[in-house]
Amino acid sequence: MTFPEIVKTTLWDIIDEMSRSLSSFVKNPDKNFIRKRKLDFKKMMHLIISMESGSLNHELLKFFEYDSSVPTGSAFYQQRSKLSVSAFRHLLKEFNLKFPLEKFRGKYYLIACDGSEFNIARNPDDPDTFHEPNGKSVSGFNMVHTISLYELCSKRYLDLEVQPGRLKNEFQAICNLMDRYIYGGSPIFIADRGFSSYNVFAHAIENHVDFLIRAKDLNVQRFLGVETLPDKLDTTIELILTRTQSKKKHKHPEKESQYRYICKNI
């Protein structure tokens, strides 16, 4: 087989294996996908990950090779509602594990983390994703925010967080992604300015991963408590992060200037 054929076969094999243990990948194991239907678990997974930009009816017709008894759009929605988010996360994880990642300098995985926004079907009744009409949108729109991990050397996505557009929290997202990281090696998480915070830094350190997060000079000075930045690239600065603002609870009062408070909501 050619390499593309190996990749496709591997993907289908993982879905076959998942179909033999459905309880972990559906919302109601006692009821979901227990009857024989045209859109069973395997076909739903195949269809969703192979859909393109056409209308739902057109995608269904293509998938079933223009069969006259193609399932309806409502049947698709009904079956899709039975799938758990964990099904797609498991598929992505297992698929990546089948093909080892490329290492930078024989040791490091360079993992970029960034956010993107996507418009979804308009629904004014969903306050978590709906944005009111403004100068750019006459009728308003709904949006979700995604934060992805992308391995630069292998050019491959590793994981993803999806958040409602109005409830996005990139700090929490990157922490969740660090917690779920399973690919071993020596990862270096690389992120832009929107991810720089004490809590993210501490979370990376607690997870024993390296990180490179860009920040404005002004923010760096504020983070480190210095008026000017040194000229040399590597500088060691010791800080103590705390959840309490009470100085009486600080264990090292002699290092009071090194304490930095982290809000409990982060």
Regions found by a protein language model. Name each.
Residues M1-L56, K62-F63, D67, P71, ...:
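Single, function-defining residue in the core of a domain
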